[in-house]
């Protein structure tokens, strides 16, 4: 395994660890999820470049589209929750409430 792959895997696991540690705040969780998507994008790009297959080149682009949709939905939810409740604490949200 090359040093670049090791660094990218470490970045992914640190983002995953950050998601587990900072799960009480929605903004911190969204930032860690974006870090995870960025490392997955870099890993898929490196895999596509090493495989020399033209079909593999579409996977990073599709992943970027899903990451952009995830970021937009996450920021919209964050804005709605912070306007409604005044905070981004996940513990204050009751998802069973209608």
Swiss-Prot record:
Its EC number is 7.1.1.2. It is a multi-pass membrane protein. Its main location: mitochondrion. GO terms for biological process: ATP synthesis coupled electron transport. GO terms for cellular component: mitochondrial inner membrane; respiratory chain complex I. Core subunit of the mitochondrial membrane respiratory chain NADH dehydrogenase (Complex I) which catalyzes electron transfer from NADH through the respiratory chain, using ubiquinone as an electron acceptor. Part of the enzyme membrane arm which is embedded in the lipid bilayer and involved in proton translocation. InterPro entries: NADH_UbQ_OxRdtase_chain4L/K, NUOK/Mnh_C1-like. It catalyses: a ubiquinone + NADH + 5 H(+)(in) = a ubiquinol + NAD(+) + 4 H(+)(out). Core subunit of respiratory chain NADH dehydrogenase (Complex I) which is composed of 45 different subunits. One of its GO terms (molecular function) is NADH dehydrogenase (ubiquinone) activity. The chain crosses the membrane at residues 2-22, 29-49, 61-81. It comes from Calomys laucha (Small vesper mouse). Keywords: Electron transport, Membrane, Mitochondrion, Mitochondrion inner membrane, NAD, Respiratory chain, Translocase, Transmembrane, Transmembrane helix, Transport, Ubiquinone. It is an enzyme of class 7 (translocase). It is found in: Mitochondrion inner membrane. It comes from the Eukaryota. This is NADH-ubiquinone oxidoreductase chain 4L. Belongs to the complex I subunit 4L family.
């Amino acid at each position: 395994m090359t040093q670049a792959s090791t660094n990218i895997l470490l970045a992914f696991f640190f983002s995953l660890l950050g998601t587990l540690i900072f799960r009480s705040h929605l903004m911190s969780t969204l930032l860690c999820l974006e870090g995870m998507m960025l490392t997955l994008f870099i890993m898929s790009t490196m895999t596509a470049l090493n495989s020399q297959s033209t079909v593999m080149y579409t996977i990073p682009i599709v992943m970027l589209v899903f990451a952009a949709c995830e970021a937009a939905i996450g920021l919209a939810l964050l804005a709605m929750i912070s306007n409604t409740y005044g905070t981004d604490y996940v513990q204050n949200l009751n998802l069973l409430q209608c």
